Amino acid sequence: MGPFGALCLAWALLGVVRACPEPCACVDKYAHQFADCAYKELREVPEGLPANVTTLSLSANKITVLRRGAFVNVTQVTSLWLAHSEVRTVESGALAVLSQLKNLDLSHNLISNFPWSDLRNLSALQLLKMNHNRLGSLPRDALGALPDLRSLRINNNRLRTLEPGTFDALSALSHLQLYHNPFHCSCGLVWLQAWAASTRVSLPEPDSIACASPPELQGVPVHRLPALPCAPPSVRLSAEPPPEAPGTPLRAGLAFMLHCVAEGHPTPRLQWQLQIPGGTVVLVPPVLSKEEDGGDKVEDGEGDGDEDLPTQTEAPTPTPAPAWPAPPATPRFLALANGSLLVPLLSAKEAGIYTCRAHNELGTNSTSLRVTVAAAGPPKHAPGTGEEPDAQVPTSERKATTKGRSNSVLPFKPEGKTKGQGLARVSVLGEIEAELEETDEGEQMEGQIPADPMGEKHCGHGDPSRYVSNHAFNQSSDLKPHVFELGVIALDVAEREARVQLTPLAARWGPGPDGASGARRPGRRPLRLLYLCPAGGGTAVQWSRVEEGVNAYWFRGLRPGTNYSVCLALAGEACHVQVVFSTKKELPSLLVIVTVSVFLLVLATVPLLGAACCHLLAKHPGKPYRLILRPQAPDPMEKRIAADFDPRASYLESEKSYPARGEAGGEEPEEVPEEGLDEDVEQGDPSGDLQREESLAGCSLVESQSKANQEEFEAGSEYSDRLPLGAEAVNIAQEINGNYRQTAG
């Protein structure tokens, strides 16, 4: 037993050693198996790892893809470290087998799409590190199966928003890192502000959980967001034409339109869901385009052959069709950019439930309408009878079919904005929008235009039976009642639109097939068409069927300053009445603004310039003068007066102590010779001469200025008996009575 047991032990140890791959180091400590494969430059998860490994470190490698089944043999792993491993892709199901996983580190990688569904099997997970990746979204239910998760780190990613209630299922969460994500702070993120203020979860760096957009909130922390005007969507659904009563079937062959109006903030996104006999159809309206040159928004779409996919024509000005009369196939449904849904031709195939769904960041709302279509009946007249369809229709039924058109104008509400009385829409580039009349060939004409409706003979240079040219209405926007044989009136020609009105037509409308004007087409009413063509010829730009009871038609999307012609004809025949007109030239709005601004600027500047010139002329002197001061030779008398009245000399004399008359024996004090004073001055500093000259010049200037005042002149004159300030009567006692002493010049 001893040798056999030792052999078994050696074999077991050898098996364990062989179970660890060569680049990795496997260590068994504390009843846990550690597999260290970090910093080995591995490109794949190594195979042959021990089945009982509990901690697997694959950090700092080059494993770009975590493939499905990579951990199928190590299902007992509780800690998986994959940081800094350049992981880009995690295949779905790669982590789902690790049901005992508690710690998962996928930080500092390049993961943009993560299989969040794998976390549903990791109910024991306690630590999840997904920071420093490229995650762009976090589904609301991604963390719903992690009740034991304590630490979640999803900072430094590309998260722009978080769904409300994302962290509600994390009852054990105590640490959450959300900072350094480019959050879009809108109504969808308001809940995070309230949650962060009330939660007990630790949120490091709250000021770094900030907004990256919109620009006005960039850099604002989420917990300091201002109040935002938010409202969930509300939906209103209406039909045109509206049903007379709920559940009333609509007549087949009508053009049916549903208008869906959704309100909310942010602006809700719309979606149509149609439950029709052929199945369920989902339509998403196109994004509303910006206003074009003419200021009109795109309203109508044009099919591209697919019955269920809506399309939209975005050309501001219609272009001639490449080939006529082959029109493009009309789609069954058109989802318009303004939220409306158009059914060009209603039939039993379009009956069903129409649902408009609106969604924004705060929720979803929807409303539905059931549409029923009446079954098509037999023909209302026998072929070859020569009777019109409406001749045998009862009066009550005829009134019901023409309800709302008693004023001979079909109400029309353009998409977006409506002004004044509406007109019947005109088809653009072969698009059928007018209601099809019921004829004996109605079943064959559904979704098609009449054969050869706009050939070259309608808009070319051929000789029609009658050609009328009228340009009078171009000179004014007033109605010009120029009535022609078939009653054509053109009015309100603008830069990009023209309205054409037809007077009531006579019973015998146009010639018959044999050319006789009095003949009537046997079996059916003649199909009347209205074309808009370039005046120089070519294929028609727009056309419309002349409907019974509709006498006004609106041509839009025209080119400014272009010649057009309106042609009134029968189907398949040449033009019988043609009116030529020109659209007005469009004056650029910028030019008008600049012109008016320049005019107002000139009007306001000219008076100011005139006033400024008058002010300058009034202030301008007649002859300029300049004051010139020239030095003059000092006058001897002025020199003497300046010496006698020198305040410094007076001050020196006052400081001397004179003896009393009695004590001095009545002797007069000796006078200091003036020559001695002059010599002292001359022997002094040369700067004294300069100061003396400056003082003399100043005295002369003062005297010249004092001449204007007689009193000042007398005070400064040598003939004045007033004593200057500082002079003593003792020194000038001899000169009081006019006994002036002559001094040597």
Curated annotation (Swiss-Prot):
Glycans are attached at residues 52, 73, 121, 338, 365, 474, 563. Residues 233-372 form the Ig-like domain. Residues 611-745 are cytoplasmic. Pfam families: LRR_8. At 11.5 dpc, expressed in spinal nerves, their roots and the ventral spinal cord. At 12.5 dpc, detected in the ventral spinal cord, dorsal root ganglia (DRG), dorsal and ventral roots and sympathetic chain ganglia. At 12.5 dpc, expressed in almost all motor neurons which also express RET and in almost all DRG sensory neurons which also express NTRK1. At 18.5 dpc, expressed only in a subset of NTRK1-expressing neurons but still expressed in nearly all RET-expressing neurons. Residues 20-51 form the LRRNT domain. LRR repeats lie at residues 52-73, 76-97, 100-123, 124-145, 148-169. Keywords: Cell membrane, Developmental protein, Disulfide bond, Glycoprotein, Immunoglobulin domain, Leucine-rich repeat, Membrane, Neurogenesis, Phosphoprotein, Repeat, Signal, Transmembrane, Transmembrane helix. It comes from the Eukaryota. The keyword Repeat applies. Residues 181-232 form the LRRCT domain. Residues 290-328, 376-423, 654-697 are annotated as: Disordered. One of its GO terms (biological process) is positive regulation of axon extension. One of its GO terms (cellular component) is plasma membrane. It is found in: Cell membrane. Coiled coil: none annotated. Residues 1-19 form the signal peptide. The modification Phosphoserine is found at residue 720. It is a single-pass membrane protein. Disruption phenotype: Sensory and motor neuron axonal projection defects. Homomultimer. Interacts with NTRK1/TrkA. This is Immunoglobulin superfamily containing leucine-rich repeat protein 2. The gene is Islr2.
